[in-house]
């Protein structure tokens, strides 16, 4: 890695530590040329493949923005949204693939959002699953009730 101070093409790792709950590695480096130290943070790249075929980096902020829209007017705070985004990223990373289709990100959002707020879940699901009629909502509400029955009894 190039030194950011003198642009020397090599550096030595002095210390490495996990950070961001194991999602990144913080490395302290030393330049053999100028002797200055600097820090780098390394993360595994996770890319989302959109329907159009375009690939873009996974963004927790984009997850939060989409879910926040569904939660508009609901009693959902920023901490809950941040936790949901972390759960979604963890689920997507758990697939082990460096690239995931955008529909898998949407699926990963649905479960935690259902547990967080049912109304927000229905709003998000209606857009994600392209509801076209009240019957689509009715089917989803029935599935939601069935899920509640299973979680209460189990």
Swiss-Prot record:
InterPro entries, per database record: ATP-cone_dom, NrdR-like_N, RNR_NrdR-like
Zinc finger (unnamed): 3-34
Any one GO molecular-function label of the UniProt entry: ATP binding
Cofactor binding remark: Binds 1 zinc ion.
Keyword hit for Transferase: no
A Gene Ontology BP annotation from the UniProt entry: negative regulation of DNA-templated transcription
Cofactor(s) of this protein: Zn(2+)
Keyword annotations from UniProtKB, A to Z: ATP-binding, DNA-binding, Metal-binding, Nucleotide-binding, Repressor, Transcription, Transcription regulation, Zinc, Zinc-finger
ATP-cone domain: residues covered: 46-136
PROSITE patterns: ATP_CONE (PS51161)
UniProt function note: Negatively regulates transcription of bacterial ribonucleotide reductase nrd genes and operons by binding to NrdR-boxes.
Cross-referenced HAMAP family: NrdR
UniProt similarity note: Belongs to the NrdR family.
The name this protein goes by in its record: Transcriptional repressor NrdR
Higher taxonomy: Bacteria, Bacillati, Actinomycetota, Actinomycetes, Mycobacteriales
